[in-house]
Curated annotation (Swiss-Prot):
Domain of life of the native organism: Bacteria
Complex formation: Heterotrimer of UreA (gamma), UreB (beta) and UreC (alpha) subunits. Three heterotrimers associate to form the active enzyme.
Protein's name according to its UniProt entry: Urease subunit beta
Gene source species: Staphylococcus saprophyticus subsp. saprophyticus (strain ATCC 15305 / DSM 20229 / NCIMB 8711 / NCTC 7292 / S-41)
Coiled-coil regions, chain positions: none
Amino acid sequence: MKPGEIIVKRTEIEVNQGHNATILNVKNTGDRPIQVGSHYHFFEANPALQFDHEKAYGKRLDIPAGAAVRFEPGDEKEVQLVEYSGKRKIYGFHGDVNGSIDESRVYKLEDDSTATEVIAEQDKTSENANKGRG
């Protein structure tokens, strides 16, 4: 053993062990590749990605930190998502949440044939200092 050397077990590393998983089919309907990072709120991913948004609310990809999933134009693949843990607050991304994760804020558009889920405008409140800024 060398000074500072770390010897680790030669076993499989399980990421997000104990988290409930959700599997979604995702299709890139756009004309450009799209990459989604490991901790990106999947609900707020690029609008060219077609998937069940309601099931993605409050969840991120079940992949190691720093990794990403790439969707080429026309690609359709299955992804596994896990819920955010900790305080369960999300800020940034597209600004759709900017606060606590609350599934009651998600609703289906009744007059839209694609049944895309969105967050009601009156529910887009922010707890941060930049509230109301671009």
